[in-house]
Curated annotation (Swiss-Prot):
EC number assigned by the record: 1.1.1.25
Entry binding sites for NADP(+): 126-130, 149-154, 213, 238
Active-site residue list: 65
Recorded family membership: Belongs to the shikimate dehydrogenase family.
Gene this chain is encoded by: aroE
Protein name: Shikimate dehydrogenase (NADP(+))
GO cellular component: cytosol
Gene Ontology BP annotations: amino acid biosynthetic process; aromatic amino acid family biosynthetic process; chorismate biosynthetic process; shikimate metabolic process
InterPro entries in the record: Aminoacid_DH-like_N_sf, NAD(P)-bd_dom_sf, SDH_C, Shikimate_DH, Shikimate_DH-bd_N, Shikimate_DH_fam, Shikm_DH/Glu-tRNA_Rdtase
Stored Pfam families: SDH_C, Shikimate_DH, Shikimate_dh_N
Pathway the protein acts in: Metabolic intermediate biosynthesis; chorismate biosynthesis; chorismate from D-erythrose 4-phosphate and phosphoenolpyruvate: step 4/7
Species assigned in the record: Histophilus somni (strain 2336) (Haemophilus somnus)
Protein backbone atom coordinates (compact mmCIF):
# COMPACT_ATOMS: atom_id res chain seq x y z
CA UNK A 1 0.00 0.00 0.00
CA UNK A 2 1.39 3.39 -1.02
CA UNK A 3 2.20 5.60 1.95
CA UNK A 4 1.56 9.34 2.32
CA UNK A 5 1.48 11.74 5.25
CA UNK A 6 1.16 15.33 6.38
CA UNK A 7 4.01 16.83 8.42
CA UNK A 8 3.66 19.73 10.82
CA UNK A 9 4.12 20.95 14.38
CA UNK A 10 1.50 21.07 15.81
CA UNK A 11 -0.34 18.53 13.67
CA UNK A 12 -3.23 17.11 15.73
CA UNK A 13 -5.63 19.68 14.25
CA UNK A 14 -4.94 18.67 10.63
CA UNK A 15 -7.89 17.63 8.48
CA UNK A 16 -5.63 16.26 5.74
CA UNK A 17 -5.87 12.58 6.75
CA UNK A 18 -9.68 12.67 6.60
CA UNK A 19 -9.66 14.47 3.26
CA UNK A 20 -7.15 12.21 1.55
CA UNK A 21 -8.73 9.03 2.86
CA UNK A 22 -12.03 10.30 1.50
CA UNK A 23 -10.43 11.07 -1.87
CA UNK A 24 -8.80 7.61 -1.94
CA UNK A 25 -12.09 5.85 -1.27
CA UNK A 26 -13.91 7.96 -3.84
CA UNK A 27 -11.33 7.33 -6.59
CA UNK A 28 -10.60 3.72 -5.56
CA UNK A 29 -6.95 4.37 -4.83
CA UNK A 30 -5.15 2.01 -2.46
CA UNK A 31 -3.13 4.20 -0.11
CA UNK A 32 -2.45 5.02 3.52
CA UNK A 33 -2.29 8.62 4.78
CA UNK A 34 -1.34 9.66 8.31
CA UNK A 35 -0.42 12.80 10.25
CA UNK A 36 3.14 13.01 11.60
CA UNK A 37 4.44 15.42 14.22
CA UNK A 38 7.69 16.86 12.90
CA UNK A 39 10.62 17.55 15.20
CA UNK A 40 11.83 21.11 14.67
CA UNK A 41 15.44 20.05 15.21
CA UNK A 42 15.38 16.78 13.26
CA UNK A 43 12.82 17.46 10.53
CA UNK A 44 15.16 17.03 7.57
CA UNK A 45 16.38 13.65 8.83
CA UNK A 46 12.83 12.57 9.63
CA UNK A 47 11.67 13.41 6.12
CA UNK A 48 14.66 11.67 4.56
CA UNK A 49 13.91 8.52 6.57
CA UNK A 50 10.23 8.73 5.61
CA UNK A 51 11.02 8.60 1.90
CA UNK A 52 13.83 6.06 2.36
CA UNK A 53 11.21 3.72 3.80
CA UNK A 54 9.25 3.82 0.55
CA UNK A 55 6.79 6.69 1.00
CA UNK A 56 5.42 8.15 -2.24
CA UNK A 57 4.64 11.69 -1.13
CA UNK A 58 3.56 14.02 1.63
CA UNK A 59 1.98 17.31 2.51
CA UNK A 60 3.85 19.93 4.52
CA UNK A 61 2.33 22.48 6.86
CA UNK A 62 3.69 25.01 9.35
CA UNK A 63 6.44 25.46 10.32
CA UNK A 64 8.21 23.30 7.73
CA UNK A 65 7.13 24.64 4.31
CA UNK A 66 10.31 26.61 3.62
CA UNK A 67 12.58 23.83 4.90
CA UNK A 68 10.86 21.22 2.76
CA UNK A 69 11.21 23.53 -0.25
CA UNK A 70 14.99 23.50 0.19
CA UNK A 71 15.13 19.69 0.39
CA UNK A 72 13.54 19.13 -3.03
CA UNK A 73 15.60 18.76 -6.19
CA UNK A 74 12.83 19.90 -8.56
CA UNK A 75 10.10 22.53 -8.14
CA UNK A 76 6.98 23.71 -9.94
CA UNK A 77 6.86 27.34 -11.12
CA UNK A 78 4.27 28.26 -8.50
CA UNK A 79 6.39 26.60 -5.84
CA UNK A 80 9.46 28.56 -6.89
CA UNK A 81 7.52 31.83 -6.74
CA UNK A 82 6.23 30.99 -3.26
CA UNK A 83 9.65 29.82 -2.04
CA UNK A 84 7.83 27.22 0.04
CA UNK A 85 6.03 23.96 -0.61
CA UNK A 86 3.04 22.16 0.80
CA UNK A 87 3.39 19.03 -1.34
CA UNK A 88 6.29 16.68 -2.05
CA UNK A 89 6.29 13.80 -4.53
CA UNK A 90 8.98 11.16 -4.88
CA UNK A 91 9.83 10.72 -8.55
CA UNK A 92 10.85 7.50 -10.28
CA UNK A 93 14.55 8.45 -10.11
CA UNK A 94 14.32 8.94 -6.34
CA UNK A 95 14.45 12.74 -6.38
CA UNK A 96 11.84 14.92 -4.70
CA UNK A 97 9.49 17.20 -6.64
CA UNK A 98 8.04 20.13 -4.69
CA UNK A 99 4.77 21.89 -5.43
CA UNK A 100 2.64 24.51 -3.71
CA UNK A 101 -1.07 23.87 -4.24
CA UNK A 102 -2.33 26.56 -1.84
CA UNK A 103 -2.97 29.11 -4.59
CA UNK A 104 -4.65 26.55 -6.83
CA UNK A 105 -6.85 25.60 -3.88
CA UNK A 106 -7.82 29.23 -3.30
CA UNK A 107 -8.54 29.91 -6.97
CA UNK A 108 -10.64 26.76 -7.31
CA UNK A 109 -12.68 27.74 -4.25
CA UNK A 110 -13.24 31.28 -5.51
CA UNK A 111 -14.41 29.77 -8.80
CA UNK A 112 -16.74 27.42 -6.93
CA UNK A 113 -18.21 30.43 -5.13
CA UNK A 114 -18.46 32.27 -8.46
CA UNK A 115 -16.38 35.06 -6.97
CA UNK A 116 -13.61 35.08 -9.58
CA UNK A 117 -14.03 37.22 -12.68
CA UNK A 118 -11.26 38.81 -14.79
CA UNK A 119 -9.77 42.15 -13.79
CA UNK A 120 -11.20 42.34 -10.29
CA UNK A 121 -9.55 44.45 -7.61
CA UNK A 122 -8.53 42.15 -4.77
CA UNK A 123 -7.13 43.50 -1.51
CA UNK A 124 -4.99 40.97 0.36
CA UNK A 125 -4.34 41.53 4.05
CA UNK A 126 -0.90 40.25 5.02
CA UNK A 127 2.43 39.83 3.25
CA UNK A 128 3.70 36.59 4.78
CA UNK A 129 4.07 33.06 3.49
CA UNK A 130 0.32 32.52 3.04
CA UNK A 131 0.11 35.49 0.68
CA UNK A 132 3.26 34.54 -1.21
CA UNK A 133 1.82 31.07 -1.79
CA UNK A 134 -1.28 32.32 -3.62
CA UNK A 135 -0.10 35.38 -5.57
CA UNK A 136 1.03 33.67 -8.78
CA UNK A 137 -2.21 31.69 -9.32
CA UNK A 138 -4.30 34.80 -8.59
CA UNK A 139 -2.29 36.90 -11.04
CA UNK A 140 -2.52 34.13 -13.63
CA UNK A 141 -6.30 34.34 -13.17
CA UNK A 142 -6.07 37.98 -14.35
CA UNK A 143 -6.72 39.59 -10.99
CA UNK A 144 -5.49 43.05 -9.98
CA UNK A 145 -3.85 42.60 -6.60
CA UNK A 146 -3.28 45.12 -3.84
CA UNK A 147 -1.34 43.99 -0.77
CA UNK A 148 -1.35 45.66 2.61
CA UNK A 149 0.57 44.68 5.71
CA UNK A 150 1.34 45.99 9.16
CA UNK A 151 4.97 46.36 8.01
CA UNK A 152 4.61 48.23 4.72
CA UNK A 153 8.08 47.32 3.45
CA UNK A 154 7.12 43.62 3.37
CA UNK A 155 4.12 44.42 1.17
CA UNK A 156 6.37 46.51 -1.08
CA UNK A 157 8.88 43.68 -1.38
CA UNK A 158 6.19 41.21 -2.43
CA UNK A 159 4.68 43.60 -4.96
CA UNK A 160 8.11 44.18 -6.49
CA UNK A 161 8.85 40.44 -6.62
CA UNK A 162 5.59 39.55 -8.37
CA UNK A 163 5.01 42.53 -10.67
CA UNK A 164 6.53 40.57 -13.55
CA UNK A 165 3.48 38.27 -13.43
CA UNK A 166 0.69 40.86 -13.49
CA UNK A 167 -0.83 43.96 -11.91
CA UNK A 168 0.12 44.20 -8.26
CA UNK A 169 0.90 47.03 -5.85
CA UNK A 170 1.41 47.64 -2.14
CA UNK A 171 -0.80 49.82 0.05
CA UNK A 172 -0.03 51.34 3.43
CA UNK A 173 -2.38 49.72 5.96
CA UNK A 174 -3.11 53.10 7.55
CA UNK A 175 -3.86 54.79 4.22
CA UNK A 176 -5.99 52.35 2.25
CA UNK A 177 -8.35 54.40 0.06
CA UNK A 178 -12.00 54.27 1.14
CA UNK A 179 -13.40 52.47 -1.89
CA UNK A 180 -15.10 49.25 -2.89
CA UNK A 181 -12.90 46.21 -3.46
CA UNK A 182 -14.34 43.26 -5.36
CA UNK A 183 -12.82 40.93 -2.80
CA UNK A 184 -10.83 41.24 0.41
CA UNK A 185 -8.76 38.20 1.40
CA UNK A 186 -7.40 37.81 4.92
CA UNK A 187 -4.05 36.03 4.69
CA UNK A 188 -2.77 37.07 8.12
CA UNK A 189 -2.24 34.65 10.98
CA UNK A 190 -3.74 36.99 13.58
CA UNK A 191 -6.81 34.79 13.87
CA UNK A 192 -4.70 32.02 15.34
CA UNK A 193 -4.15 34.28 18.35
CA UNK A 194 -7.81 35.26 18.48
CA UNK A 195 -7.05 38.72 17.05
CA UNK A 196 -7.83 40.62 13.85
CA UNK A 197 -5.82 42.96 11.67
CA UNK A 198 -6.19 46.67 12.49
CA UNK A 199 -8.01 47.89 9.37
CA UNK A 200 -10.39 50.79 8.84
CA UNK A 201 -13.87 49.22 9.25
CA UNK A 202 -15.19 51.31 6.35
CA UNK A 203 -13.00 49.26 4.02
CA UNK A 204 -14.77 46.09 5.14
CA UNK A 205 -18.21 47.69 4.97
CA UNK A 206 -17.71 48.58 1.30
CA UNK A 207 -16.27 45.21 0.24
CA UNK A 208 -18.27 43.20 -2.28
CA UNK A 209 -17.04 39.98 -0.65
CA UNK A 210 -14.55 38.85 1.99
CA UNK A 211 -12.62 35.60 2.28
CA UNK A 212 -10.65 34.36 5.28
CA UNK A 213 -7.93 31.79 4.58
CA UNK A 214 -8.35 30.58 8.15
CA UNK A 215 -10.94 27.91 8.89
CA UNK A 216 -12.76 27.12 12.10
CA UNK A 217 -15.32 24.35 12.45
CA UNK A 218 -16.51 25.37 15.89
CA UNK A 219 -17.26 29.07 15.32
CA UNK A 220 -16.57 32.05 13.09
CA UNK A 221 -12.94 33.07 12.77
CA UNK A 222 -12.15 36.44 14.41
CA UNK A 223 -11.91 38.07 10.97
CA UNK A 224 -15.26 36.72 9.81
CA UNK A 225 -16.85 37.77 13.09
CA UNK A 226 -15.46 41.28 12.54
CA UNK A 227 -16.81 41.39 8.98
CA UNK A 228 -20.26 40.28 10.07
CA UNK A 229 -20.23 42.99 12.72
CA UNK A 230 -19.55 45.50 9.94
CA UNK A 231 -22.53 44.26 7.95
CA UNK A 232 -20.71 42.22 5.31
CA UNK A 233 -22.96 39.45 4.01
CA UNK A 234 -20.91 37.81 1.25
CA UNK A 235 -18.39 35.89 3.35
CA UNK A 236 -16.45 32.62 3.21
CA UNK A 237 -13.85 30.96 5.41
CA UNK A 238 -10.94 28.87 4.14
CA UNK A 239 -12.53 25.41 4.27
CA UNK A 240 -12.93 25.33 0.49
CA UNK A 241 -9.30 26.36 0.02
CA UNK A 242 -8.27 23.54 2.35
CA UNK A 243 -10.26 21.04 0.29
CA UNK A 244 -9.00 22.48 -2.99
CA UNK A 245 -5.31 22.40 -2.14
CA UNK A 246 -5.71 18.81 -0.93
CA UNK A 247 -7.44 17.80 -4.17
CA UNK A 248 -4.64 19.31 -6.27
CA UNK A 249 -2.01 17.52 -4.17
CA UNK A 250 -3.90 14.24 -4.56
CA UNK A 251 -3.97 14.77 -8.33
CA UNK A 252 -0.21 15.36 -8.39
CA UNK A 253 0.39 12.06 -6.63
CA UNK A 254 -2.25 9.82 -8.17
CA UNK A 255 -3.07 11.35 -11.57
CA UNK A 256 -6.80 11.55 -10.83
CA UNK A 257 -8.67 14.63 -9.64
CA UNK A 258 -11.16 13.83 -6.87
CA UNK A 259 -14.67 15.24 -6.92
CA UNK A 260 -15.00 17.85 -4.18
CA UNK A 261 -18.57 19.05 -4.67
CA UNK A 262 -20.04 16.42 -2.29
CA UNK A 263 -18.10 18.06 0.53
CA UNK A 264 -20.15 21.22 0.09
CA UNK A 265 -23.57 19.65 -0.43
CA UNK A 266 -24.14 18.12 2.97
CA UNK A 267 -22.34 16.25 5.72
CA UNK A 268 -21.08 13.32 3.70
CA UNK A 269 -17.93 13.18 5.80
CA UNK A 270 -16.90 14.72 9.08
CA UNK A 271 -14.14 17.25 8.50
Amino acid sequence: MDKYAVWGNPIAQSKSPQLHRYFAKQTRQNLDYVAILGDEEKFEQQLSDFFAQGAKGCNITAPFKERAFKLAQQHSKRCLSAESCNTLKKLADGTLFADNTDGAGLVSDLQRLNWLKPNQRILILGAGGATKGVLLPLLQAQQNILITNRTFSRAEDLAHKFNQFGTIEALDLKHIPIQTFDLIINATSTGLQGKTIDINPQILQLASAVYDMQYSKESDTPFIALCKKQGVTKISDGFGMLVGQAAHAFYLWRGVMPEIDPLFSGNEIKI
